[in-house]
Amino acid sequence: MALREIIILPDKQLRLVSKPIEKVTTEIRKLADDMFETMYDAPGIGLAAIQIAQPLRLITMDLAKRDENGETKPEPRVFINPEVIASSEELSVYEEGCLSIPEYYEEVERPAKVRVRFTDLDGKVHEEDAEGLYATCIQHEIDHLNGVLFVDYLSKLKRDRVLKKFEKAAKRAE
C-alpha cells in the first residue's frame, strides 16, 4: 500500500468524467488499497479514484460505527462502477466536506434514499438501498466520478466565492 497525493481544487482533473473499469485486476485491487491508506491518512470517510488523479470509476468508503464499548469498527467498502439507479423524492440535508476542498464545509440537499448498483472487488454485482450518511456519501463520491463537486449544489454566489478562494491559494502556492 502507498499513500497517494490528493488533488485539490482548482485542479481541472476533478472535472473529468471517470472511465468504467472493465475488469477487476491486481492493479485495481492495489489502487483500492492505496485509496484506503490515503483516505484513512487524510482522514476521510470516502475517496473517489479521480481525487488521486486516477480517472476510473472506483470509490472507497468507510462509515465506521462505534460498538457498545465505544470502539470504532472499520467497515471498508469498495464500489466499482457505482451508479444510482433510483432515488427518493424525499430530500435530506447534510453538512458535506471534501478531501479535495480542504477545510470547507457546507450544507447540501440530496435525495434522502437511493438504490445503488456496483461491482465489488470479487467482480460480483450488488444492488443496495442507502439512506442517511451512507446515501449522502455514496452520492457525493459518485458525483466525483462524473466531474461534479459538492460546491456545484451551492448558490452561484457561494460557489464562486469558494472557487475564487481556492484559485487564489493555488496561485500563491506556485
Swiss-Prot record:
The keyword Iron applies. Keywords: Hydrolase, Iron, Metal-binding, Protein biosynthesis. Fe cation binds at residues 98, 140, 144. It is an enzyme of class 3 (hydrolase). InterPro entries: Peptide_deformylase (IPR023635), Peptide_deformylase_sf (IPR036821). One of its GO terms (biological process) is co-translational protein modification. Belongs to the polypeptide deformylase family. NCBIfam families: pept_deformyl, PRK00150.1-3. This is Peptide deformylase. It comes from Bradyrhizobium diazoefficiens (strain JCM 10833 / BCRC 13528 / IAM 13628 / NBRC 14792 / USDA 110). The lineage of its organism: Bacteria, Pseudomonadati, Pseudomonadota, Alphaproteobacteria, Hyphomicrobiales. The gene is def.
